């Protein structure tokens, strides 16, 4: 799971001299989805580009790469998707607010796009039971059943 750095955010966190400043809250969704995958027995690592360097060479062996997009980070997410397609065998999944608003755009870069809240479909998508190019996830019926983010998978 990678949350790409964006060129612009409304109240942007930033890096200066190797240290991150400000608050980033865009990683919560990926940490929830990663926690679901981890609980099901998958090896999961999450990275937020803004908080440090992502070891892309290390990720060359990944089977699946999930990219989370805000509108401000979509160009970077698409750049990363192209890199993973060119340099790895990984399937690339794209989700997040921007992908939910413009799924056809995201589908040009991803093997699959998750539209909406992915908690109910992420496991089936990753394990190949859902193969649609654009996956429309249903709205959660009971918010109390959504797990807490698993910060243990965050590597940066």
Q: Where does each model-flagged region fall?
A:
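Acidic, low-complexity intrinsically disordered segments
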Residues: 1-156
